[in-house]
């Protein structure tokens, strides 16, 4: 009976069904399966699908464990949602070690330790694409971030990967990989003079662009640097007030797909401030900040400098996490702190990689497809 609905109405209804549920419906109807594979529908679904908090943690076995945080049931609660991995552990890839992950638009790019490949992966559909980098990816600081540019007429998104080794005010080499054309090329771009990433692992994606904390040596101030995948240029952005790197703790996150968020605290100050941007101007790149709320500082609030966090703007709740020991067992401690500083704590038992911290993403399971080449289909992908 549902199939007798007008196509436009049917698509509008299905766009509001979580991707994880749609995935289970693929085999029930050929028409729906074709629809779910349609790029236009996938994009429409991603834009309208309900968002959810998802924590991903690199485990000792190099899989990603996930924990869903529900802030909309009156009282914050958590649910273990299982293990995820782009690697088939029953294959000859069992020695593959995921070193870093970066999330953009429902997709992950995973850096593989001591390998020459990275992998772009959709956890919801299981689709993945292995990409040769031409370099052995050891722990020398090589990083890969994913972004996109959007066609103004068709609204189609084309994905790119930026490759770099840190970022500083000296000589630097950047490369870009276009997923559509399956090609690497050197990027002729000049870093912002006198600026360097305070930590290249503190990076987030918003509206297809990538953002990092950066320190200006001349002004001696902490700020942000963004990379625009349309112009392929870096931009300097400012924080809500002047911050010296030696005097402040700081963390960076996103609120939905619309705003940036930072936690700032003058060292030894009694309260931490949570700031978010107003909607940024896509043309001028200008943005303004407003303080959402403050929370008291205490040892029971796990919000140290650079640690991942998420913010619910409507409920004024900040969610943050930390590794710790509980009864001699490694656990992830998730704290949900409200504007009145009331805190709820969740313990997430998981065997983590020794040197890795939990990785927070404001994640929407999506049906977005990763463009493949004929050669890539034959890549050692098992």
UniProtKB/Swiss-Prot annotation:
Annotated disulfide bonds: none
Xref: InterPro entries: F-box-assoc_dom_typ1, F-box-assoc_interact_dom, F-box-like_dom_sf, F-box_dom, Gal_Oxase/kelch_b-propeller, SCF_F-box_component
PROSITE patterns recorded: FBOX
Domain named F-box: residues: 1-49
Pfam families the UniProt entry points to: F-box (PF00646), FBA_1 (PF07734)
CDD domains: F-box_AtFBW1-like (cd22157)
Protein name from the UniProt record: Putative F-box protein At3g49980
Gene source species: Arabidopsis thaliana (Mouse-ear cress)
Lineage of producing organism: Eukaryota, Viridiplantae, Streptophyta, Embryophyta, Tracheophyta
């Amino acid at each position: 009976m549902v199939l007798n609905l007008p196509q436009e109405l049917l698509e509008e209804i299905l766009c509001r069904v979580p991707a994880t549920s749609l995935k289970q419906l693929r085999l029930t109807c050929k028409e729906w399966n074709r629809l779910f594979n349609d790029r236009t529908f996938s994009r429409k679904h991603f834009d309208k699908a309900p968002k959810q908090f998802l924590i991903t943690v690199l485990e000792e076995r190099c899989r990603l464990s996930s924990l869903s945080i529900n802030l909309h049931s009156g009282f914050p609660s958590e649910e273990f949602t299982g293990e995820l991995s782009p690697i088939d552990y029953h294959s000859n890839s069992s020695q593959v070690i995921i070193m870093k992950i970066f999330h953009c638009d429902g997709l992950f790019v995973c850096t593989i330790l001591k390998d020459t490949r990275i992998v772009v992966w959709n956890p919801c559909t299981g689709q993945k694409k292995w990409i040769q980098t031409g370099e052995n990816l050891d722990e020398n600081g090589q990083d890969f971030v994913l972004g996109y540019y959007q066609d103004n007429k068709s609204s189609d998104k084309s994905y790119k990967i930026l490759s770099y080794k840190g970022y500083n005010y000296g000589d630097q080499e950047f490369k870009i990989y276009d997923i559509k054309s399956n090609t690497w090329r050197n990027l002729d771009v000049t870093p912002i003079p006198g600026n360097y990433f305070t930590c290249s692992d503190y990076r987030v994606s918003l509206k297809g662009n990538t953002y990092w904390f950066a320190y200006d040596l001349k002004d001696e101030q902490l700020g942000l640097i963004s990379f625009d995948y349309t112009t392929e240029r870096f931009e300097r952005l400012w924080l809500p007030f002047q911050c010296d790197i030696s005097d402040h703790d700081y963390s960076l996150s996103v609120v939905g797909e619309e705003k940036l968020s930072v936690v700032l605290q003058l060292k030894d100050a009694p309260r931490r401030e949570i700031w978010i941007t107003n909607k940024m101007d896509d043309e001028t790149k200008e943005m303004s900040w407003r303080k959402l709320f403050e929370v008291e500082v205490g040892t029971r609030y796990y919000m140290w400098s650079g640690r991942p966090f998420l913010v619910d703007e409507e409920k004024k709740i900040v969610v943050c996490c930390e590794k710790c020991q509980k009864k001699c067992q490694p656990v992830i401690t998730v704290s949900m702190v409200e504007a009145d500083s009331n805190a709820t704590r969740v313990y997430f038992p998981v065997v983590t990689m020794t040197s890795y911290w939990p990785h927070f993403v404001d994640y929407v399971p999506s049906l977005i497809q990763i463009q493949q080449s004929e050669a890539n289909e034959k890549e050692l992908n098992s």
